Amino acid sequence: MNALLSNPFKEGLREGDTQIGLWLSSTTSYMAEIAATSGYDWLLIDGEHAPNTVQDLYHQLQAIAPYASQPVIRLIEGSKALIKQVLDIGAQTLLIPMVDTAEQARQVVSATRYPPLGQRGVGASVARAARWGRIDNYMAQANESLCLLVQVESKVALENLDAILEVEGIDGVFIGPADLSASLGYPDNAGHPEVQRIIESCIYRIRAAGKAAGFLAVDPAMAQKCLAWGANFVAVGVDTMLYTEALDSRLAMFKSVQSVSTAKRSY
């Protein structure tokens, strides 16, 4: 099969496009397809906090595939075996959480690339990503089209940010506001002025290094701030949060109950 692999999400980052995304935590292909018809530039399938199996991820990739929205898979960790499985089922963009050092970043890069660039295991004949062995020159194309994003979300990671940004093969850095604020001593308070100052500084440093900067902001005002600071891939909501807010709001129209959605909520 003389097919060329492409990754529109990665191409958009290279061109400096601003890409607006949505977090998918519901673990179902049905909900993933509904989200894919909404027109978001990218959809994050969460394999870290949501109870997704590899097969769940596979079905959601299938559901999103016919649409323009681009899937990004966040793994529970950057293990070589798990990365291999998820790339084989067709993921082209990965988000790896809790990357604290440049050495961790290099290990993740190696796990995502075929030799001689890395240590990804070869099994194209059983991989959806290679159309079960039918894509010519698949290994070289896979190395080129892969987009690798890492999460900086701890005090240690902040100290090592410049070194992480120097690692070849990292396309972007995503700031994890919930874990970062907790690590800095402000749990559940990403809006604290000191946390905000650090987030703005991180976005500037990431973009200055020629990498893409990402963020999840469930508050629209915070999302606008991050975009103004230079973040170029920003998730502006979480499906489960949007669902619960809608359910609570609708119930409050008919029953005298206090909607939990009126309280301050964070991811």
From Swiss-Prot:
* UniProt-annotated binding residues for substrate: 151, 178-179
**Does the UniProt entry include the keyword Magnesium?**
yes
Which residues does the annotation say bind Mg(2+)?
Answer: 153, 179
InterPro entries annotated for this entry? Aldolase/citrate-lyase_domain (IPR005000), HpcH-HpaI_aldolase (IPR050251), KDR_aldolase (IPR023593), Pyrv/PenolPyrv_kinase-like_dom (IPR015813), Pyrv_kinase-like_dom_sf (IPR040442)
Question: GO cellular component annotations, sorted alphabetically?
Answer: cytoplasm
EC identifiers of the protein? 4.1.2.53
* Residues flagged as site, Transition state stabilizer: 74
Sorted alphabetically, the keyword list is: Lyase, Magnesium, Metal-binding
- Please give the cofactor(s) recorded in the UniProt entry for this protein: Mg(2+)
Give residue numbers for the site Increases basicity of active site His.
Answer: 88
- Catalytic residues (UniProt): 49
Q: Which domain of life is it from?
A: Bacteria
Give yes or no: UniProt keyword Transferase.
no
Q: MF terms per GO, please? A: 2-keto-3-deoxy-L-rhamnonate aldolase activity; magnesium ion binding
Manner of cofactor binding, per the entry note: Binds 1 Mg(2+) ion per subunit.
The family database entries (PANTHER family) matched by this protein are listed as:
2-KETO-3-DEOXY-L-RHAMNONATE ALDOLASE
Q: Subunit comment for this entry? A: Homohexamer.
What does this protein's UniProt record list under function? Answer: Catalyzes the reversible retro-aldol cleavage of 2-keto-3-deoxy-L-rhamnonate (KDR) to pyruvate and lactaldehyde.
UniProt name for this protein: 2-keto-3-deoxy-L-rhamnonate aldolase
The organism of origin for this protein: Salmonella gallinarum (strain 287/91 / NCTC 13346)
Phylogenetic lineage = Bacteria, Pseudomonadati, Pseudomonadota, Gammaproteobacteria, Enterobacterales
